[in-house]
Amino acid sequence: MNESSEANDLAIRRQIIDETKCVVVKVGTRVLTTSDGKLDLERVDRLAEQLCRIADTGRQTIMVSSGAVGAGVAKLGLPQRPTDLKSLQAIAAIGQADLIGAYEKSLQKRGRHAAQVLLTRNDLRRRSGYLHVRNALNGIDELGAIAVVNENDSVAVSELKTTFGDNDRLAAQVAGLFNDVMLILLTDVSALYDGHPDEKDSQPIHMVHDVDDGVMALVDDQVSTVSKGGMGGKLRASKLANSHGHPTIIGSGTEEFVLDRIFAGDAVGTLFVPPKRSLKGRRRWIGSSANVAGTLFLDQGAVDAIQKHGRSLLAIGIQRVEGTFAHGNVVRLVGPNGEEFGRGLSNYRSHEVARIAGKPSEQIEWILGHRPYENVIHRNNLVLRIVPE
């Protein structure tokens, strides 16, 4: 990095820090456990110390912490992480107690408390649940506590591998509840590299403006026996956070006082800079958290009207309906190429859309006996930039 680009990097980092009102820090299993699989209490304590310093600046501070299953495996003295659902659920419950206890002990001696928040994806799929979670996190902050969020592995079923996918995505979705957020993903590598981190010629990438296919191609994702995420998952989480307007830093959680360095404006890790335009409010929920209840397959004319001209979706542009959904449910939009390009809130139920598909709007009342809406999805309830799960 030359001097001018380094100065620009640092200036952008300082501006982001100045604008940040909420900080979401995610720390992975491999950062929180020792080489023999036990919970690293010293590292938990150092992280808690830095979280308190961030909170002392007046910023809302949220920790998304992995490690429950790993802590449970260590506590029970198991030789390896089980793969069956029943064991994983029980071990997560046992390990979560140790995990939250370690945070509480470290935070309490610094005048704060840990507030355990366990989530599944269903908690964020409904708009009401999405708002309830946000209100709860705000309430925790108002009491001066620090929320420690984890996926609720102990009651998840298939969710152990498919709810959020991993805690990186969970952290990005928690960040999406708020505005003016910085997301920090702490892992066991110092940054995103232009090659394999272990290769001597590989160089760290200090700043990324677009998580495109070229950036994704840099990682060879490996999911370990003690964690569910990988660098690919962190890039997808960064892209999701960026779509909300939130800058993201991927850095080393094993580096001592890494959070202090980030907020000192040092060039730590890789900074993912969001675009100027980003999803807000309800459209953010539609695009990243809401449950998708069905699919509408559109002709090219409808795709062009939506993508190029910002139009609402009319019934005449729908070729086929898949799934069962109600009025107000989120549906995905698929073009003739078979690829999803957007999501939106349907004004009609699935069986109604199937009946009016391909028909002009003026025929809706004749077909259904009523026409509460001229369009199937209003443009204000459409989101085109979708981050793949």
Swiss-Prot record:
Signal peptide: none annotated. It comes from Rhodopirellula baltica (strain DSM 10527 / NCIMB 13988 / SH1). PROSITE patterns: GLUTAMATE_5_KINASE, PUA. This is Glutamate 5-kinase. GO terms for cellular component: cytosol. The keyword ATP-binding applies. Substrate binds at S66, D153, N167. Its main location: cytoplasm. It catalyses: L-glutamate + ATP = L-glutamyl 5-phosphate + ADP. Pathway: Amino-acid biosynthesis; L-proline biosynthesis; L-glutamate 5-semialdehyde from L-glutamate: step 1/2. GO terms for biological process: L-proline biosynthetic process; proline biosynthetic process. It is found in: Cytoplasm. Belongs to the glutamate 5-kinase family. PANTHER family: GLUTAMATE 5-KINASE (PTHR43654), ISOPENTENYL PHOSPHATE KINASE (PTHR43654:SF1). GO terms for molecular function: ATP binding; glutamate 5-kinase activity; RNA binding. Its EC number is 2.7.2.11. SUPFAM superfamilies: Carbamate kinase-like, PUA domain-like. The keyword Cytoplasm applies. ATP binds at K26, T187, D188.
